[in-house]
A protein has these predicted regions:
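Helix-loop-beta hinge of the Bergerat
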Residues: 3-38, 96, 100
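Short beta-strand patches within cytosolic ATPase/nucleotide-binding catalytic cores
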Residues: 25, 62, 107-109
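Conserved DxG motif in ATP/Mg2+-binding regions
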Residues: 26, 70-82, 119
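Short, contiguous acidic/charged loop-to-helix segments that flank catalytic cores in large enzymes
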Residues: 33-37, 81-86
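Conserved ATP-binding N-box helix of the HATPase_c
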Residues: 35-62, 67
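ATP phosphate-binding glycine-rich loop and adjacent ATP-lid/helix-beta elements
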Residues: 47, 51-54, 84-118
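Short beta-strand/loop element within the Bergerat-fold HATPase_c
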Residues: 60-77, 111-112
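C-terminal end segment of the histidine kinase catalytic
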Residues: 125-129
Length: 129
C-alpha cells in the first residue's frame, strides 16, 4: 500500500464517520509502500476507534500515520461529551489483544470523555516472523 492508497482508505472511513455526525480527519505520511500485514493492523485500530466514536455523542476523531525505517506509528485521539464506557472498554480490550498478537508496542489511555492510542506497528522481518 503506497501513501495515496492508505490515505484513501483512511479518508473514506473519515467521510463515512462525518456522514453520521462524527467529526473526523486523517493524515498519512509514509515514504515507502507498506506491507499488507502492517496496513491490516492499522485498519483494525482505525475501525475500533471508529466503532467507539460512532457510539459516542459529539465525537471528534483525529488519526495520524507516520513511518520510520523500522515501523509505522499510528496516533488516534477521540474526544466526546460522553463516550459509552462499557463499549469503549470492550472494544479496547479486543484491540489490546489484537495488538499483542501482532507484537505491536502500544499505549491506550481512556476516560469518560476521551481516548488515545499510540501504536508502533513493526515491519515484518524476513521469513514473516
Amino acid at each position: 500500500f503506497n501513501r495515496e492508497r492508505l490515505q484513501l482508505v483512511f479518508n473514506e472511513t473519515a467521510a463515512d464517520l462525518r456522514s453520521i455526525g462524527v467529526e473526523c480527519a486523517a493524515l498519512v505520511q509514509t515514504n515507502t509502500p507498506l506491507p499488507a500485514s502492517v496496513v491490516s493492523v492499522l485498519y483494525d485500530c482505525l475501525y475500533d476507534f471508529a466503532t467507539v466514536a460512532n457510539a459516542a455523542s459529539d465525537a471528534v476523531l483525529m488519526l495520524f500515520v507516520q513511518q520510520d525505517e523500522r515501523r509505522v506509528q499510528l496516533r488516534a485521539m477521540l474526544d466526546s461529551s460522553d463516550a459509552e464506557s462499557e463499549r469503549m472498554a470492550t472494544t479496547f480490550d479486543e484491540l489490546r489483544a489484537s495488538l499483542e498478537k501482532h507484537r505491536v508496542e502500544y499505549s491506550i489511555e481512556a476516560d469518560s470523555s476521551s481516548a488515545s492510542l499510540v501504536a508502533y506497528v513493526p515491519f515484518p522481518t524476513k521469513g514473516g516472523k
